[in-house]
């Protein structure tokens, strides 16, 4: 297995997007593109990416704008352009897919999105799902239109006084404030992330996982999420696209499984034929960093392998 870092120009025409590819030592069975979550970065997926690469998959992913190494200065951490940030982030995912397809045009192409990356991937599917062999939607959730509109309005009001690069603890608290409630008393306020103490401590100590989103980033994230709750938003998703929803049963982002199931049911109701759900009992938000993560890895590998075989036979 070989790991290689590279950069490409963001759709914002300014930022250099940092990306990593994990290349297997054997013939490539398929491609897996990963979309990471909020306030983290792609190299945190190294253990899982190595596992998939060892089993013959080319894995690739990038740091979203305002994350990891996809910044110009440290002040850019947690910042999206307040006008077109969501458009740029989606565009960067598409660019990476196009580059990767040119390298490997003849193998099945899978995608995985975690947390914020799951919301981005769900939005992405309403535009660019054609030709995908399957997608894994991990650690997702659901917010209603009124909640998202209220969130955008609050961002606009505060930004009128503080500017779009302001980091509002109030907005941050509205978004994440209640997530740790079930796990109190805790040492870090991040117990909701994973039950694996070692992984959790690494997360808490990591400066690239401990900043606050700017108002511009929150505003654009809420803007993108609005797409998901618009009537008819899933009409453009191919009915034959295999979709796996997966999360921890103790993940507050998905309302402890309730909202993951809700989104899963929406996909079924939209007529998508191969849609399934797997909730891991007792796991929290980052199932790829949980104590039973090897089981999660194997389950994802099996699910992708089954769809890969189907794709090869069709």
Model-derived regions: residue spans:
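Conserved alpha/beta-hydrolase
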Residues: 44-75
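Short beta-strand/loop motif that positions the catalytic acidic residue
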Residues: 245-247
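Alpha/beta-hydrolase active-site loop
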Residues: 81-101
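Alpha/beta-hydrolase-fold enzymes
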Residues: 123-208
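Alpha/beta-hydrolase fold nucleophile elbow
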Residues: 104-115
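Catalytic active-site module of serine/aspartate enzymes centered on a nucleophile-bearing elbow/loop
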Residues: 270-314
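Active-site glycine-rich loops that stabilize anionic/oxyanionic intermediates
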Residues: 32, 36-40, 115-116, 249-250
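N-terminal cap/lid segment of alpha/beta-hydrolase-fold proteins
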Residues: 1-26
């Amino acid at each position: 297995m070989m790991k290689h870092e590279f950069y490409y120009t963001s759709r914002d025409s300014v930022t250099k997007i940092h990306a990593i590819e994990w290349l297997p030592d054997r013939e490539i069975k398929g491609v897996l593109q990963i979309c990471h979550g909020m306030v983290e970065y792609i190299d945190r997926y190294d253990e899982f990416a190595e596992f998939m690469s060892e089993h013959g998959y080319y894995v690739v992913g990038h740091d979203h704008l305002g994350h990891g190494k996809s910044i110009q200065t440290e002040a850019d951490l947690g910042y999206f352009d307040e006008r077109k940030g969501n458009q740029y982030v989606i565009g960067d995912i598409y660019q990476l897919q196009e580059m990767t397809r040119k390298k490997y045009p003849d193998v099945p192409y899978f995608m995985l999105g975690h947390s914020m990356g799951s919301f981005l991937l769900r939005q992405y599917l309403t535009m660019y799902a054609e030709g995908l062999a399957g997608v894994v939607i991990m650690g997702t959730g659901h917010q209603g239109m009124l909640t998202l509109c209220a969130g955008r309005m609050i961002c606009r009001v505060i930004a009128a006084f503080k500017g779009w690069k302001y980091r509002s603890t109030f907005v941050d608290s509205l978004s994440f404030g209640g997530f740790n409630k079930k796990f109190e008393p805790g040492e870090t306020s991040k117990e909701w992330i994973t039950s694996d103490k070692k992984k959790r401590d690494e997360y808490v100590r990591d400066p690239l996982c401990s900043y606050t989103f700017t108002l511009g980033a929150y505003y654009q994230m809420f803007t993108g999420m609005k797409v998901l709750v618009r009537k008819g938003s899933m009409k453009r998703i191919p009915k034959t696209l295999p979709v796996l929803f997966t999360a921890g049963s103790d993940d507050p982002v998905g309302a402890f499984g309730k909202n993951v199931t809700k989104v899963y049911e929406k996909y079924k109701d939209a007529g998508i034929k191969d849609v399934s759900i797997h909730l891991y009992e007792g796991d929290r938000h980052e199932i790829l960093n949980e104590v039973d993560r090897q089981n999660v890895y194997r389950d994802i590998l099996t699910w992708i392998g089954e769809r890969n075989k189907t794709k090869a036979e069709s």
